[in-house]
């Protein structure tokens, strides 16, 4: 950060001896009441197909509320809220973490049924996102602001894993607050991937940080945070890791296994859909917050160019529907020159048998991965939902994803929303791809397990596409079991019928995901903080090659 410089640390970073960056001092200005104009809102809410009334100004959040107050969402509705709502709020508040008297995040889980804590007593960046959205929707932005500032401090340090120095823009995967009752001090220890199962840096943390910064700005109307030199620099550092020129011939990001929510070896190395969708959303979010002064103008120009290329690439080469599947089935191979139709030399014989039965005549989705001679046909829920929210998916593609969910409800939702991926890996394929991972056995954990946290992303995607009835159906399933099962981390089985064999109870993002989904359904105007409308000026003209087969 400006004026602070970098500090060399070991494999763990600690705040114990470092004076706090007093970023909040520069932010102690009266919040601006901003009348949202069309240019700020990207597109009027009335243009959404949901049929809900337009939410014109910035969502007004009552000031001076304590984080222990009664949820506003309950008071805003004329009907009696589900009993789970109050209990979910109590559980969420129990997970709050304080640093020197200020709330800075929520623990991954508060499971008192086991003595094995592992790393669930830490604040994970990706895990905190639904908690942050719940607090923002409830008019409690302070915890989100403190979290953004605290993680920004951690980004500013020099980071080393063994003898290797990580990029300056890398955000932590998680951090832990250590309380010393004798000295009455609080210290922070951060993990940048050196303590993770696969020792992989979290690629998604920086993207979620930018997306959350925009959500905070949209929810509160407080531009002073995103416009500080520190936040401006933080965004640029994150993007500098992604926009650097190298040997890439694709606009997508090349990633290792285990760098995102799927944090174990699951065959997603290469160009996973989750990272590409988050990358696209982070680019668009940053574009709305970066100031065009100094080097900001150059960064903005690079973002715009990358967005053009990335949207074209993803919409053409990652998209799969019945027609595209038939085209790939008929592909010729070993094509050379720029006129090649099978640009990645995907072998038709590599198409798995299950996808022919899985693909309906109406519907489609973004496949899990596309690279040289490689196409991962698995469905990944997070990547497809974020593609809708970020408008990486065109309106037609967004509707097709929703059609697929309805057609394949039993497979993708079953008895507990939502399958993180489909189908599972099993047998010889499981042994080769996962390395015989005992946690990722068939229909468990990241290998086809069902994750309640994905409910909020599903609900947001449903509202944006005008299909809230799909979300309500999923919420009904959640309300029939989640509280009774003590808010588990994930469910196992082909239908998601069984609590996961290693699932933590009272998993915070399962709790927060439910709250966000309920509040979105109660007040669909909240969608504005986590949704980006299609940018007509950015939208490229998509044309297929003249040699593309006409079937």
Swiss-Prot record:
Effects seen without this gene: Reduced primary root length and increased length and number of lateral roots. Reduced plant growth and early flowering. Reduced seedling levels of glucose and fructose, but increased levels of sucrose.
GO cellular component: cytosol; membrane; nucleus
Residues covered by region (Disordered): 50-74
Impact noted for substituting residue 547 to A: No effect on catalytic activity, but prevents interaction with 14-3-3 proteins
Entry's pH dependence statement: Optimum pH is 7.0-8.0.
Description of what induces expression: Induced by mannitol in roots. Induced by hydrogen peroxide. Induced by dark-to-light transition in roots.
Temperature-dependent activity: Optimum temperature is 9 degrees Celsius.
UniProt keywords, alphabetically: Acetylation, Carbohydrate metabolism, Cytoplasm, Glycosidase, Hydrolase, Nucleus, Phosphoprotein
One annotated GO biological process: root development
Catalytic reaction annotation: Hydrolysis of terminal non-reducing beta-D-fructofuranoside residues in beta-D-fructofuranosides
Superkingdom, taxonomy of origin: Eukaryota
EC numbers: 3.2.1.26
Residue positions where N-acetylmethionine is found in the record: 1
Alphabetized Pfam families for the sequence: Glyco_hydro_100
GO MF, one example: beta-fructofuranosidase activity
Distribution of this protein across tissues and organs: Expressed in radicle, hypocotyls, root tips and vascular cylinder, leaf vasculature, shoot stipules, trichomes, stem, stigma apex and base of siliques.
Biological role: Cytosolic invertase that specifically cleaves sucrose into glucose and fructose and is involved in the regulation of multiple tissue development including primary root elongation, root hair growth, leaf and silique development, and floral transition. Is involved in osmotic stress-induced inhibition on lateral root growth by controlling the concentration of hexose in cells. May regulate sugar-mediated root development by controlling sucrose catabolism in root cells. Contributes to carbon partitioning and cellulose biosynthesis in seedlings.
Family that this chain belongs to: Belongs to the glycosyl hydrolase 100 family.
Subunit composition and interactions: Forms homohexamers. Interacts with PIP5K9. Interaction with PIP5K9 represses CINV1 activity. Interacts with GRF1, GRF2, GRF3, GRF4, GRF5, GRF6, GRF7, GRF8 and GRF10; these interactions are dependent of the phosphorylation at Ser-547.
Protein name: Alkaline/neutral invertase CINV1
């Amino acid at each position: 950060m400006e004026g602070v410089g970098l500090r060399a640390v070991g494999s763990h970073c600690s705040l114990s001896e470092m004076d706090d960056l007093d970023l909040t001092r520069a932010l102690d200005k009266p919040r601006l009441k901003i009348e949202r104009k069309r240019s700020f809102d990207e597109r009027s809410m009335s243009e959404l197909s949901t049929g809900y009334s337009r939410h014109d100004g910035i969502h007004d959040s009552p000031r001076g509320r304590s984080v222990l107050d009664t949820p506003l969402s309950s008071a805003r509705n004329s009907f009696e809220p589900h009993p789970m709502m109050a209990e979910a709020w109590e559980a969420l508040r129990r997970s709050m973490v304080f640093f020197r008297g200020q709330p800075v995040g929520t623990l991954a889980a508060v499971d008192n049924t086991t003595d094995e804590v592992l790393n669930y007593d830490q604040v994970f960046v990706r895990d905190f996102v639904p908690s942050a959205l719940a607090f923002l929707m409830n008019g409690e932005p302070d915890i989100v602001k403190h979290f953004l500032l605290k993680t920004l401090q951690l980004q500013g340090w020099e980071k080393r894993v063994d003898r290797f120095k990580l990029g300056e823009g890398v955000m932590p995967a998680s951090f832990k607050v250590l309380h010393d009752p004798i000295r009455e001090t609080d210290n922070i220890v951060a993990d940048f991937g050196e303590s993770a199962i696969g020792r992989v840096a979290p690629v998604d943390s920086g993207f979620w940080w930018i997306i959350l910064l925009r959500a905070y700005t949209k929810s509160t109307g407080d531009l002073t945070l995103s416009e500080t030199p520190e936040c401006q620099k933080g965004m640029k550092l994150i993007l500098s890791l992604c926009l650097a020129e190298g040997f890439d011939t694709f606009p997508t990001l090349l990633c290792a296994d285990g760098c995102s929510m799927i944090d174990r070896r699951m065959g997603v190395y290469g160009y996973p859909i989750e990272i590409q969708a988050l990358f696209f959303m982070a680019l668009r979010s940053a574009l709305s917050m970066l100031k065009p002064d100094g080097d900001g103008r150059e960064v903005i120009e690079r973002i715009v160019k990358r967005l053009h290329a990335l949207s074209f690439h993803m919409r053409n080469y990652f998209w799969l529907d019945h027609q595209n599947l038939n085209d790939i089935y008929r592909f010729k191979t070993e094509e050379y020159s720029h006129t090649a139709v099978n640009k990645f030399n995907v072998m038709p014989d590599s198409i798995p048998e299950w996808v022919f039965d899985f693909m309906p005549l109406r519907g489609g989705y973004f496949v899990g991965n596309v690279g040289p001679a490689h196409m991962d046909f698995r469905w990944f829920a997070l990547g497809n939902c974020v593609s809708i929210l970020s408008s990486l998916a065109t309106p037609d593609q967004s509707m097709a994803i929703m059609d697929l969910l309805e057609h394949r409800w039993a497979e993708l939702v079953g008895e507990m929303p939502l399958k993180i991926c489909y189908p599972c890996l099993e047998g010889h394929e499981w042994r080769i791809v996962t390395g015989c991972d005992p946690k990722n056995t068939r229909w468990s954990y990241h290998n086809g397990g069902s994750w309640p946290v994905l409910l909020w992303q599903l609900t947001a995607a449903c509202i944006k596409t005008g299909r809230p009835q799909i979300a309500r159906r999923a919420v009904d399933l959640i309300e029939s079991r989640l509280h009774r099962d003590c808010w588990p981390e994930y469910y196992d089985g082909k239908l998601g019928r069984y609590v996961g064999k290693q699932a933590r109870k009272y998993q915070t993002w399962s709790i927060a995901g439910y709250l966000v989904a309920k509040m979105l359904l109660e007040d669909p105007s909240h969608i504005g903080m986590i949704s980006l409308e299609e940018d007509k000026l950015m939208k490229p003209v998509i044309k297929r090659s003249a040699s593309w087969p006409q079937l």
